[in-house]
């Protein structure tokens, strides 16, 4: 009997299934034949809780890192403050008063996912490994996006059996499976930054032409198709390019090393190939032309009109900067977050800073910001050469709030559950001593 797991085809199948599992965590969705409230993130969360309890029973102890406890405490403090704001304002919009539940669901999902990956590989999951899977999941989502857009039977299957936000379909925007609009764009952003980190700091990647080509190719694919899904992806693309420019060269060195010349040559060649393909499809496919013009609207407006702007940026500047209009509103907000609750007041804003302030005041906004700053400091301490990575993740958090009220804790949950560089070194040292 052929051992499927040991064959090349078998390995490819297992890798695809794991990438699908990662995608189901990072881009959660439901099924039409399951209860409406149940999605893939929650399924993985239940799996994670079961595995965690089994590990606790096996080890006869309940253990989690101190930083998870601190992060949980900050999430609970923020939730309590949001609840106080709702009580103070006499509302029942508990969107973020229940944030602590979201914390536990993401942590459970991350723990379950990391347990699956570890079981498949038989070793601890580290940052390079989880970056590979997240990259694969995002490229897979890009493939889903194109299939939904250009293969009718696939779109019909997704629309029939997959339960997800339908806003993208209603707005005639591109979407994948659990991936659409700004929430999908923000997740693309985080992975673009992780790819840049691997290209800049991982010697196994930089010493391998194949790995370098694959990561650069993935970076470009996610940047292009991700922008077709949501132009928020541009933020991650620019931060990733900035990260690579600072760490790999160009930004502070007058003379380039051989490694830098090779890296940027490969990058420019692959970029030229992508541009060539883009120009071909732009000129020969009306639908692709429309998608390219949406994805890079600012560029086209600059070339054609001399204005570096988009329709959404104009709307943000003109109508969406809305702040509290009473003194106590600046402290406690108005206890309203969901769009439907604001319609009666004629208020519509996507801007994260405004929505959080209107919901729970500047105090709540500050608590939420502190929560993500702390999560980033954990990343800086847990992984080698990760200070710049942590800083860029903080910049991403506060940058996306200019456009939308979402967050990136799903990434931090994964990074909390994988092994840190220094922990891995200790395990390797212990294993060497035992041998």
Predicted ranges, named:
Residues 1-13, 205, 256-264, 268-272, ...:
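A juxtamembrane structural motif centered on a specific transmembrane helix
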Residues 13-30, 46-108, 395-399:
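N-terminal hydrophobic segments of proteins, predominantly signal-anchor/transmembrane helices
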Residues 67-75, 113-153:
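Interfacial loop-to-transmembrane-helix boundary motif in multi-pass membrane proteins
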Residues 131-156, 179-229, 234-247:
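Alpha-helical transmembrane segments of multi-pass inner-membrane proteins
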Residues 158, 162, 299-360:
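Long extracytoplasmic/lumenal interhelical loops at the membrane interface
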Residues 175, 180, 336, 345-379:
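A conserved mid-to-late transmembrane alpha helix and its immediate loop/hinge
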Residues 193-197, 241-242, 388-398, 405-435:
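Transmembrane alpha-helices of multi-pass inner-membrane enzymes
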Residues 242, 250, 359-400:
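Hydrophobic transmembrane alpha-helices and their immediate junctions
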């Amino acid at each position: 009997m052929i051992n499927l797991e040991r064959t090349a085809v078998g390995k490819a199948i297992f890798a695809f299934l794991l990438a699908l599992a990662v995608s189901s965590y990072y881009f959660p969705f439901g099924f039409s034949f399951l209860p409406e409230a149940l999605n893939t993130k929650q399924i993985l969360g239940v799996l994670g809780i079961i595995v965690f309890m089994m590990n606790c029973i096996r080890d006869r102890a309940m253990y989690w890192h101190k930083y998870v406890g601190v992060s949980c405490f900050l999430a609970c403090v923020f939730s309590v403050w949001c609840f106080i704001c709702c009580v103070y304002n006499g509302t029942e919009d508990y969107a973020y008063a229940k944030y602590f539940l979201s914390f536990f669901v993401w942590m459970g999902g991350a723990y379950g996912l990391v347990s699956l990956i570890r079981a498949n590989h038989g070793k601890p999951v580290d940052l390079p490994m989880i970056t590979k899977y997240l990259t694969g999941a995002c490229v897979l989502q890009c493939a889903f996006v194109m299939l939904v857009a250009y293969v009718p039977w696939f779109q019909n299957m997704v629309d029939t059996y997959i339960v997800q936000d339908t806003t993208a379909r209603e707005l005639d925007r591109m979407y994948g499976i659990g991936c659409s609009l700004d929430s999908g764009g923000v997740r693309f952003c985080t992975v673009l930054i992780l790819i840049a980190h691997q290209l800049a700091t991982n010697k196994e990647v930089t010493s391998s032409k194949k790995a370098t080509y694959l990561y650069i190719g993935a970076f470009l694919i996610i940047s292009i198709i991700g922008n077709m899904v949501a132009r928020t992806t541009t933020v991650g693309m620019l931060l990733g390019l900035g990260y690579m420019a600072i760490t790999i060269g160009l930004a502070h060195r007058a003379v380039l090393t051989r490694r830098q010349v090779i890296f940027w040559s490969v990058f420019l060649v692959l970029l030229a190939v992508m541009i060539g393909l883009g120009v071909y499809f732009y000129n020969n496919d009306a639908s692709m032309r429309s998608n390219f013009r949406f994805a890079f609207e600012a560029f086209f407006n600059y070339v054609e009109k001399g204005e570096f702007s988009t329709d959404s940026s104009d709307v943000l500047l003109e109508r969406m900067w809305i702040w509290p209009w009473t003194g106590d509103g600046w402290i406690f907000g108005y206890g309203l977050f969901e769009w439907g609750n604001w319609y009666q007041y004629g208020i519509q804003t996507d801007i994260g800073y405004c929505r959080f302030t209107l919901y729970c005041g500047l105090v709540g906004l500050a608590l939420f910001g502190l929560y993500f700053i702390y999560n980033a400091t954990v990343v800086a301490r847990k992984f080698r050469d990760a200070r710049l990575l942590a800083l860029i993740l903080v910049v991403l958090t506060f940058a996306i709030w200019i456009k939308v009220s979402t967050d990136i804790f799903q990434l931090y949950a994964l990074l909390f559950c994988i092994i840190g560089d220094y922990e891995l070194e200790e395990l390797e040292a212990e294993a060497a001593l035992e041998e």
